[in-house]
């Protein structure tokens, strides 16, 4: 719930905090720039370390960044720093998921399984954005949405790291020609 609520609701969150909603556009730009760096870094890191553990680490650090940002009163500086952190961690899942799918299931089914993995991410994004809006409409505050986002992210990260520790990785098997 956390990351998607951030994109769809940040402009409104900043406005109700008395900040210029244009800061939301600037933050989205920072997120986009750091997405590139994070994707490159995690692609590199996934070649060297356990991809599943790295994925779990991303989920945990996203949640910690979300908790940090919403525990503080927002300022332009903290908002842009938060955007940089989230951007670095956001799309870093792409190369890790692709590599993990290849290692876990082989290359023969990679396109289908990777498609299902990203479809589930998109369904989660929809539920997060829509759910965050519903929570705000019902309660007049995003606090519960942030707490749910942090809790789900921490749980996902811990489960992912635990799974990484019990499941050994293997090189992907070649698909038949």
Protein language model regions, located:
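Multi-pass alpha-helical transporter architecture, strongest
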Residues: 150-177
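Helix-loop junctions at membrane interfaces in 12-TM secondary transporters
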Residues: 71-82
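Structural signature of the two symmetry-related core transmembrane helices
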Residues: 53-68
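Intracellular juxtamembrane helix-capping segments at the cytosolic ends
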Residues: 92-105
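Loop-to-transmembrane helix entry/capping segments in MFS-fold secondary transporters
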Residues: 21-22, 107-117
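A membrane-interface helix-boundary motif in multi-pass transporters
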Residues: 134-152
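Extracytoplasmic gate region of multi-pass secondary transporters
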Residues: 1-42, 128
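Helix-to-loop junctions at the C-terminal end of transmembrane segments
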Residues: 39-50, 136-137
């Amino acid at each position: 719930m956390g990351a998607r609520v951030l994109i769809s609701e940040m402009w409104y969150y900043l406005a109700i905090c008395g900040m210029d909603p244009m800061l939301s556009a600037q933050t989205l730009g920072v997120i986009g720039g750091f997405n590139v760096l994070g994707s490159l870094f995690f692609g590199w890191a996934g070649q060297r370390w356990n991809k599943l553990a790295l994925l779990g680490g991303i989920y945990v650090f996203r949640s910690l960044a979300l908790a940090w940002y919403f525990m503080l009163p927002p300022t332009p500086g903290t908002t842009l720093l938060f955007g940089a952190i989230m951007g670095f961690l956001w799309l870093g899942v792409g190369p890790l998921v692709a590599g993990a799918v290849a290692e876990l299931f082989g290359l023969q089914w990679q396109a289908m399984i990777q498609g299902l993995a990203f479809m589930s991410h998109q369904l989660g994004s929809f539920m997060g954005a829509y759910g965050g809006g519903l929570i705000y409409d019902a309660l007049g505050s995003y606090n519960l949405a942030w707490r749910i986002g942090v809790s789900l992210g921490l749980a996902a990260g811990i489960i992912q790291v635990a799974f990484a520790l019990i499941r050994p990785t293997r090189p992907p098997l070649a698909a038949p020609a």
